Design a protein with these regions (language model features):
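Rossmann-like dinucleotide-binding cores of NAD(P)H-dependent redox enzymes
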Residues: 181-228, 301-350, 437
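Flavin-dependent oxidoreductase catalytic cores
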Residues: 1-162, 166, 170-182, 190, ...
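Short, hinge-like loop/turn segments at secondary-structure boundaries
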Residues: 31-34, 83, 105-108, 200-204, ...
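Extracellular/periplasmic ectodomains of large secreted or surface enzymes and adhesion receptors
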Residues: 119, 123-166, 177, 191, ...
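Rossmann-like dinucleotide/flavin-binding elements
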Residues: 156-184, 230-241, 252-265, 273-327, ...
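Residues at the C-terminal ends
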Residues: 8, 59, 81, 177, ...
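A structural motif
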Residues: 11, 84-85, 245, 309, ...
Length: 456
């Protein structure tokens, strides 16, 4: 009835949204939330106006706009066709690809650069004091600095790209389009690097869409430009010497952090990335302990609990899980980890591993933050909170039973080959981009690759 009164008051159109900032993930739904997650709301509004025969002030049906993860042309089109809404509203999908509408209209859906719902650039950068950007579109927010069309290379070069993750792919695509002869080498049988592994859980469907987009762009670029791709190829110094490239771009990722915990030899131990690729290694393991409460650890926990029905515990030595992640994404995942029965232990240090469990020192003080709190920390890491209370220590030693221990402690930049190439002068120009330069997110990997590719 409130909406009916608004129509009488002169409202011409309704944007039907959901959520408030007590649950950050609803006002701007992150990765993991279903496509078209708020369509039920717009449908309810449309049915209300139809049932009560309420017309707009111009005598037509009251227009209702749907919003919320509608950057999928098939779902957006179906919502309008089925009468669930009259229009759809897009925001983040247009940051990822300003030509979304034109490509959808032309039927070139595979060429739409998809939003991955990470909110690394559009929300997090803004919160940290910057301006809205985009993890998958480096031009967003920098349109004056980077023209829409690439400037042709002044001197065409033979370039080798070592590594087929998001950084290597982004560089290869742009450099080839600018006229360089580019050869990309990938040691595995598929492209994608860390995003290929990270897109395995069902909730990571947005990342899978992005990977499919990159693969499609590579196919088109190989057909139209001087781009060659060699998968299942390990690059050596000898190979680079033999080819005599003008430039070599290293983009081969990180080394996994594997601390020398006491008892690691006897423990049933596996890296989180290895388990994602080989879930059969968790067969027979009911109680699983994950060491590391970053994004990989928490997403792996959700995957194990929801797709394989495992009892999962995640250990994190810091006060908060997934530090640095956008509050919406972080809160959404924490909320569903709690609903899935995943045990989160923060302020917990691993002391030793055993065949049947993990020995830890856990701070059980009442001042330790609630690990399931979806809105803490309240302020970004670059702004100190004067109201934040100090965490006191009440350390308790305990053993957490485990049939399988999963290490998800992140990785560090693997610069070994880069420095070796420099010492041996394997090319006139040698660069290091992506995680092999500095372990980071899709945002940093794509941005760094783009900045180099447009000027080399």
């Amino acid at each position: 009835h409130y909406m009916a009164k608004l129509v009488r008051a002169g409202v011409d159109l309704f944007d039907v949204d959901l959520g408030c900032y007590d649950n950050w993930w609803l006002p701007h739904p992150p990765e993991g939330m279903p496509a078209g997650c708020f369509l039920d709301m717009s449908k309810i509004a449309k049915e209300f106006f139809r049932r009560n025969r309420i017309k707009s002030n111009t005598g037509v049906d009251v227009p209702v706009v749907a919003v919320g993860k509608l950057g999928y042309p098939d779902i957006a089109e179906k919502a309008i066709r089925d009468g669930d809404c009259d229009m759809v509203m897009l925001a983040r999908p247009l940051l990822a690809d300003p030509d979304w509408c034109n490509k959808a209209f032309a039927g070139n859906v595979e060429e739409i650069r998809p939003c991955i719902g990470c909110q690394e650039g559009c929300v997090n950068e803004f919160i940290l004091g910057g301006h809205p950007q985009c993890a998958v579109n480096p031009r967003t927010g920098f349109e004056e600095r980077f023209p829409e069309t690439f400037t042709p290379a002044e001197k065409k070069k033979n370039i080798a790209v070592v590594g087929g993750g998001p950084a290597g792919i982004t560089f290869a695509l742009i450099a080839a389009k600018r006229g360089h002869n580019v050869t990309l080498y990938e040691k595995s049988e598929k492209l994608g690097g860390k995003i290929a592994v990270g897109s395995i859980p069902k909730i990571k469907f947005d990342l899978r869409n992005y990977l499919a987009y990159l693969e499609k762009q590579m196919e088109l670029c190989q057909e139209q430009y001087q781009l060659q791709v060699h998968k299942s190829t390990t690059v050596t110094a000898e190979l680079l010497k033999e080819k005599a490239y003008d430039s070599v771009i290293f983009a081969y990722g990180t080394k996994e952090i594997f601390p020398p915990f006491e008892g690691r030899e006897e423990a049933n131990l596996i890296l989180g990335t290895d388990l994602l690729e080989h879930p059969e290694k968790a067969e027979g393991a009911n109680n699983i302990v994950i060491v590391g409460g970053g994004v990989v650890g928490c997403e792996t926990a959700h995957w194990l609990a929801n797709e394989y029905g495992k009892n999962v515990t995640v250990l994190e030595m810091l006060p908060h899980f997934m530090m640095g992640v956008c509050t919406a994404n972080r809160g959404h995942l924490l909320h569903y980890l709690e609903k899935s029965g995943v045990r989160l232990y923060n302020c917990t240090k691993v002391k030793a591993l055993a065949k049947d469990g993990v020995y830890v020192e856990q701070n059980q003080s009442q001042t330790v933050p609630d690990p399931y709190n979806t809105w803490q920390p309240l302020l970004p890491p670059n702004i100190p909170n004067p109201m934040e209370k100090a965490i006191k220590e009440e350390i308790v030693e305990k053993k957490i039973p485990a049939d399988l221990i999963v290490l998800a402690m992140g990785g560090k930049a693997d610069e070994t080959f880069f420095f070796e190439a420099g010492e041996e002068h394997l090319a006139k120009e040698i660069y290091n981009i992506g995680d092999s330069s500095r372990a980071g997110r899709v945002l940093e990997a794509v941005r760094g690759a783009y900045h180099l590719a447009v000027r080399i």
